[in-house]
């Protein structure tokens, strides 16, 4: 199996020689070896240290050696937001942001979007290689036979308010899902249960299979319609669209153009290296918890507007612009910092996001089937003018994956509060791929970042009667809107 092969590869790499590769060098280094080191001089005491370079990284623990006095703990690396810190070695997704390259397990995203389907890409990400036909058939069958929800779980979803946010419903339901499978909880069944590939795979089938059902139920709940049950002989995205839209038609068939469009969108969103939610997945999993808890936590990270809400912000921006005639003024406002240009630029990509090129094409295919979305003309003209403007080009601001995806979802009839849900379904496959890799990595440790403490150094306890008024934060300066909202909550 691919999992066992990767374990053997990792084990072979962890020879004594390689374990010492990133350690501090205490003996002279030859001229040739010097090319693979970096010399750090501590100007506080004049001492110099040679650190080995491996895979373009330096072991952060080396800096503990930079001490003024023995045992003082040395130096730490300060990196807010992990902007230049690698915490894992991964074999899943490769990104070259300067060249605009994205590959899953070595396969260009363009080829996978053109020729593959979502469940095949899911197999690739989680297992490491593309399956043959019998492997893909078995994989797809196991996932599609785990699409149904327990009646008690359905009952739980029905207790949410009629206007509950679909993402909140999804997160809560996924977290609750773990309570239905205590045999998959290391806290109950033993910390080593996921050494069993069968136990591990069972949870993958369940999560990948049930997420579209949970998402569809959240959508139906929001619009006040009865939940639909899955139809397992349909494809993954076809079944999802069926559960979303079927009313009373005896032979309802989702639009095949929309099925394929959603398939491509799911492929493009399946993984993107160590983004915020994937890092959360690995962080939570490092404590040894079950994957349902970890996926719910990762989904919570994705719920944040800076991560999973970007395409909604693009849509709001395009609606605000309104027409092509207003674009020059909008661009002028962006340059003068009066407005923000959403859907352009990326923390990693300093070139055109390869996913955006694919989504642009998919958008036009969807509009040909459903009718043109008026905002597409605004989007394409905004893209054209921005890419011809030196202000944006010099800052390497190119369209990203969110620029067109929201337009497609809007054309398909999804409200903006479903956008993060549509992001979560495919990204869960990436989370699970990282979960498997984390379980198999012999270097895995519980995540425990350091901090730089800048608080009070030492204070003696003072009895309450002898204390002056304490300095308070902003608790007493709520906005009037917030105060009203809190008063409504507390009055119920």
From Swiss-Prot:
GO biological process, one term: glyoxylate cycle
Organism: Dictyostelium discoideum (Social amoeba)
Family label: Belongs to the citrate synthase family.
Catalytic function, reaction form: oxaloacetate + acetyl-CoA + H2O = citrate + CoA + H(+)
Pathway(s) annotated for this protein in UniProt: Carbohydrate metabolism; tricarboxylic acid cycle; isocitrate from oxaloacetate: step 1/2
PROSITE patterns per the UniProt record, alphabetical: CITRATE_SYNTHASE (PS00480)
Keywords, comma-separated and alphabetical: Peroxisome, Transferase, Transit peptide, Tricarboxylic acid cycle
Biased composition (Polar residues): 475-484
Function: Peroxisomal protein involved in the cellular biosynthesis of citrate, and required primarily for cell growth and modulation of multicellular development.
EC number from the UniProt entry: 2.3.3.16
Gene3D superfamilies: Citrate Synthase, domain 1 (1.10.580.10), Cytochrome P450-Terp, domain 2 (1.10.230.10)
UniProt main location, coarse: other
Protein name, UniProt field: Citrate synthase, peroxisomal
Coiled-coil regions listed in the entry: none
Keyword GTP-binding: no
Location in or out of the cell: Peroxisome
């Amino acid at each position: 199996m691919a999992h066992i092969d990767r374990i053997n590869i990792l084990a072979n790499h962890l020879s004594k020689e390689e374990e010492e590769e990133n350690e501090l060098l205490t003996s002279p280094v030859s001229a040739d070896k010097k090319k693979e080191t970096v010399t750090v001089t501590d100007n506080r005491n004049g001492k110099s240290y040679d650190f080995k370079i491996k895979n373009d990284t330096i072991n952060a623990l080396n800096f503990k050696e930079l001490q003024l006095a023995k045992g003082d703990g040395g130096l730490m690396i300060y990196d807010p937001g992990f902007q230049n810190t690698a915490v894992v070695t991964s074999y899943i997704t490769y990104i070259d942001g300067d060249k605009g390259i994205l590959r899953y397990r070595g396969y260009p995203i363009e080829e996978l979007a053109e020729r593959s389907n979502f469940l095949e890409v899911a197999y690739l990400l989680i297992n490491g290689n593309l399956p043959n036909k019998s492997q893909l058939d078995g994989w797809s069958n196991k996932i599609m036979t785990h699409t149904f929800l327990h009646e008690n779980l359905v009952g739980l979803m029905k207790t949410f308010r009629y206007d509950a946010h679909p993402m909140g419903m999804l997160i809560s339901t996924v977290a609750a899902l773990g309570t239905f499978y205590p045999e998959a909880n290391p806290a109950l069944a033993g910390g080593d249960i996921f050494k069993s590939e069968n136990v591990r795979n069972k949870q993958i089938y369940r999560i990948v299979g049930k997420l579209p059902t949970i998402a569809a139920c959240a959508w139906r709940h929001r619009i006040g319609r009865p939940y639909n049950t899955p139809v397992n002989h349909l494809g993954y995205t076809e079944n999802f669209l069926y559960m979303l839209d079927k009313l009373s038609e005896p032979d309802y068939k989702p639009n095949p153009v929309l099925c394929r469009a959603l398939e491509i969108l799911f492929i493009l969103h399946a993984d993107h290296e160590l983004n915020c939610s994937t890092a959360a997945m690995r962080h939570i999993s490092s404590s040894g918890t079950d994957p349902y808890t970890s996926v719910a936590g990762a989904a919570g990270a994705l719920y944040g507007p800076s991560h999973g809400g970007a395409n909604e912000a693009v849509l709001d921006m395009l609606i605000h612009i309104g027409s092509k005639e207003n674009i020059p003024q909008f661009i002028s406002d962006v340059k003068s910092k009066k407005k923000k240009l959403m859907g352009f630029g990326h923390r990693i990509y300093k070139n055109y996001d390869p996913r955006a090129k694919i989504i642009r094409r998919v958008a036009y295919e969807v509009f040909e089937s459903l009718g043109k979305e008026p905002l597409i003309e605004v989007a394409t003209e905004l893209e054209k003018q921005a890419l011809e403007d030196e202000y944006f080009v010099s800052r390497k601001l190119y369209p990203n994956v969110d620029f067109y995806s929201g337009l497609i979802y809007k054309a398909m009839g999804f409200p903006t509060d479903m956008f993060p849900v549509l992001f979560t379904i495919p990204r869960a496959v990436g989370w699970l791929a990282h979960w498997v890799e984390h379980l198999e990595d012999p270097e895995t440790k519980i995540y425990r970042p350091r901090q730089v403490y800048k608080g009070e150094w030492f204070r003696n306890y003072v009895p309450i009667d002898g204390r002056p008024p304490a300095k308070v934060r902003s608790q007493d300066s709520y906005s009037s809107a917030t105060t009203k909202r809190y008063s409504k909550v507390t009055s119920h």
